[in-house]
């Protein structure tokens, strides 16, 4: 007896969002099926692959392959430029873990400048990931969204406490 798959009902719609600007802009979402359920219906935009970079630089990369790939890079923007050459990379995710008040407690201004420098160094869309401290992330996200207005960045880790103020700068 042949196998006949039963289609899953998914009554919601995942909105399509365009990250970045220019030739390397990439769209995510846009389907009305459960994630990865291509057997139920066509998925408009295939899943994308991002390269995560930390603001802590090369000190955090301990795997031999990572060290070899980023060899010669001395700054995070240089690493972003190198990551752009990875086959299949659709976006850069900048993780600002050095901003954590319980860690290095980098200043908001320093993180904003780094985000600008990374954005200038690469043509790939930029995703910003905070330090997981609600108060610091609120300030970080607002300042970075303001500084990179018009670049269609994605702010990860936004919570109910802080996402609405970021929308002021990211909406067209």
Explain the meaning of each model-derived region.
Residues 4-54:
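N-terminal basic/disordered segments at the start of proteins
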Residues 46-50, 90-93, 125-127, 152-154:
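Structural preference for beta-strand elements that scaffold enzyme active sites
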Residues 51-77, 104-105:
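Active-site mouth loops of central-metabolism enzymes
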Residues 54-56, 97-99, 129-133, 158-160:
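Active-site beta-loop-alpha junctions enriched in small/polar residues
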Residues 83, 144:
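Conserved, mostly hydrophobic/aromatic
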Residues 90-112, 132:
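Glycine-rich, proline-tolerant flexible connector loops at the mouths of alpha/beta enzymes
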Residues 106-126, 148:
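Alpha-helix-loop-beta-strand connector modules within alpha/beta enzyme cores
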Residues 169-172:
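Conserved small/polar residues in nucleotide/adenosyl-binding loops
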């Amino acid at each position: 007896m042949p196998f006949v798959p039963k289609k899953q009902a998914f009554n919601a719609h995942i909105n399509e969002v365009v990250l970045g600007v220019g030739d390397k802009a990439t769209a995510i979402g846009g389907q009305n099926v459960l994630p990865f359920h291509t057997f139920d219906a066509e998925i408009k935009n295939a899943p994308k692959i991002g390269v995560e970079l930390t603001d802590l630089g090369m000190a955090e990369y301990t795997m031999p392959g990572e060290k070899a790939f980023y060899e010669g890079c001395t700054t995070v923007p240089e690493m972003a430029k190198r990551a752009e050459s990875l086959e299949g990379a659709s976006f850069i995710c900048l993780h600002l873990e050095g901003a954590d008040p319980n860690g290095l407690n980098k200043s908001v201004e320093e993180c904003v400048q780094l985000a600008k420098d990374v954005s200038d160094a690469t043509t790939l869309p930029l995703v910003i990931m905070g330090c997981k401290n609600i108060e610091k992330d609120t300030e970080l996200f607002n300042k970075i969204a303001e500084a990179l207005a018009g670049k269609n960045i994605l702010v990860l880790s936004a919570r109910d406490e802080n996402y609405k103020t970021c929308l002021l700068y990211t909406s067209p």
